[in-house]
Amino acid sequence: MDGLTAPIAADVAYKQLLQRQSTTRPQGDAPLPLTPPPFDAASQLINVTGAHAFTAPGSGDARGECPGLNALANHNYLPHNGIATINQFVSATTQVFGMGADLALFLSTYGAVIDGSGTSWSIAGGPHIGIGGSHGNYESDSSPLKSDLYQYGSNSKLILEQFHELYDMQPNAATANYNLDVLRTFRNQRFQESIDKNPLFVYGPFTGMAVSQAAFTFIYRFMANHSAEYPEGVLNKDVLKSFMSISGPENNLVWTPGHERIPSNWYRRNTADAYTIPYFETDILYFTSSNPQLNLVGCNEGKVDTYQNIDASTLSNGAYTAAQAAANPICFATEFALAELPGLTGLSLTSGVLGSLTSVLSSVTKNLGCKAIGSVNTTALALCPGFSLYGGPTAPVAPGAIQS
């Protein structure tokens, strides 16, 4: 172990989280806590009645790429128009999903500062308004269920063929559980599909190594239903369909855009087992253990199946080797994002609203014991014709794109 990864590995809680990777639980071969988390029905049941009853979005309400955020707005845990402040995002995601406060503050602040007004942002929207226009700096290719921007001309369309790929991995409704083991397999399939079908596929330092992994891990970690029998959570077919706005029988599934719903009698993860940044890091490492390529930045070069890796040392001007980035992907991704901010925004790290994001990112890297990246070499990304910092929610379909 080198000095770069020693600080985080020395953390007792992080060590305990890593131990779960070698354990199996009743639901199957998936990484789960060594000791089942507590279950408290009264505190974990999420209210979906009264003020929090499902209300379909109206014509002026924003609904975008993230099914969880759409569901929060549909149940009025976020403002129903889909535009919320940093504090509102933090409150809703921690209260309803059991997201760790550190992760919630990180994601909410980044979204508001880079893709919003500085203090608020939209769960849809275009560039500098919300997540819909964040392709290249936040939203990314190889989503679990949503379309690659340059493959389909949209980054917010749910592709039913992709949903079927995941849904059909658990054929028996009585025992179905879309846990992390299932999602790891699906993650690998989707990564390869973007290589095979999206000529402008980009897997970036922050958008790929961190954000795109979250799109998969969050499905199980935040959508599973918890119980006394299964305190770790089970994500069955009906709950998955509800959160993804899918209805109908298995031979005729239908997607209704923006109608994501929290199911009745749904119990979130216990906040004593909050999904923190170190917790998320161990899930990334579980994913990459089966596919080391997920640890490497890369892209297609304008045609399908032309994927090339880009060396972490080149991108970080020697601050991280490829092995160091792979050992601690959150450190590399966050430090890269931090070093990239001046070029991304045209502002200094201490100026105005950017100072608040700098403070949040610096807190993350300090707690993880990360080595700083003094400057980034974004010219290395010139290899990637699909690379941009602000794109979406629509774009021309790339020549040669293959649609499922």
Predicted regions and their residues:
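Polar/charged low-complexity regulatory segments
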Residues: M1-R63, P67-G68, L78-S404
